[in-house]
């Protein structure tokens, strides 16, 4: 049966607005079992086509529609409207510059991601086929490779808010450990050297916001803890 959805949406167009404001929007949906992105798509198509947001896969895979939903970061496409208290308050991801409405500038986030060398480094002779792993070695990557780089975790972290140019952030550090833990990679020492800094790694204080908001159920804090353990072991 049809349902009415009430939302309060952060709006800001730098070309015409002096400051941000919250817009009250009401939209009708034909079905009660819908995702938040369905409501936003309906608003953009039928109510206000100036609303700006990122979205793509609608399946929780691309991570592009990450936003702050009722005070908690998440993906609009995997957040069921039935789980949300109305009016639903939507804001852009915190800690990053707002480009327009719910769209943020991800430049700093991806700069930190690229700083950890997010690819295999292996200078040994290339095998005729793939580089093999045992099942146990492969299992070490579970809970790491599934990250979709939506930035929900990093933008929920106070340390990233305060030091986005120095602290790699939960997402970047999770990816750093993903390659450190990979038996095919030969750059562990270099990767640890890259993180040997008062800010890049050790600014994590295990607040656990990153774990709470990850839409894929990953645990960046656990990965960060393992990197810290490796740092301590090589120092003694």
What are these regions (language model features)?
Residues 48-54:
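Active-site phosphate-binding and catalytic loops of NTP-dependent enzymes
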Residues 57-66:
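Short, structured protein-protein interaction patches enriched in aromatics and acidic/basic residues
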Residues 33-46, 91-236:
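Ferredoxin-type iron-sulfur electron-transfer modules in oxidoreductases and energy-metabolism complexes
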Residues 2-7:
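Short structural boundary motif marking the start of a folded domain
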Residues 28, 68-71:
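Short strand-turn-strand beta-turns centered on an Asx-Gly dipeptide
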Residues 23-34:
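Short, contiguous acidic and Ser/Thr-rich linear segments
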């Amino acid at each position: 049966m049809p349902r009415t959805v009430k939302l309060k949406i952060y709006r800001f167009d730098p070309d015409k607005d002096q400051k941000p404001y919250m817009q009250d929007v009401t939209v009708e949906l034909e079905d009660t079992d819908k995702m938040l992105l369905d409501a936003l798509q309906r608003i953009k198509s039928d109510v206000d086509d100036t609303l700006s947001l990122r979205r793509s896969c609608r399946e929780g895979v691309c991570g592009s529609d990450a936003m702050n939903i009722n005070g908690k970061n998440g993906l609009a496409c995997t957040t069921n409207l039935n789980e949300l208290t109305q009016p639903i308050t939507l804001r852009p991801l915190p800690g990053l510059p707002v480009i327009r409405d719910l769209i943020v500038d991800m430049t700093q986030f991806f700069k930190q991601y690229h700083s950890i060398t997010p690819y295999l480094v292996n200078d040994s002779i290339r095998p005729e086929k793939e580089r093999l792993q045992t099942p146990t070695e492969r299992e070490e990557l579970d809970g790491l490779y599934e990250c979709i780089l939506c930035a929900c975790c990093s933008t929920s972290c106070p340390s990233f808010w305060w030091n986005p140019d120095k602290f790699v952030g939960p997402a970047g550090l999770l990816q750093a450990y993903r390659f450190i833990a990979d038996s095919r990679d030969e750059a562990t020492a270099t990767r640890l050297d890259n993180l040997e800094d008062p800010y890049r790694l050790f600014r994590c204080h295990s607040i656990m916001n990153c774990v709470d908001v990850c839409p894929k159920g990953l645990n960046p804090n656990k990965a960060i803890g393992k990197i810290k353990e490796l740092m301590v072991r090589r120092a003694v």
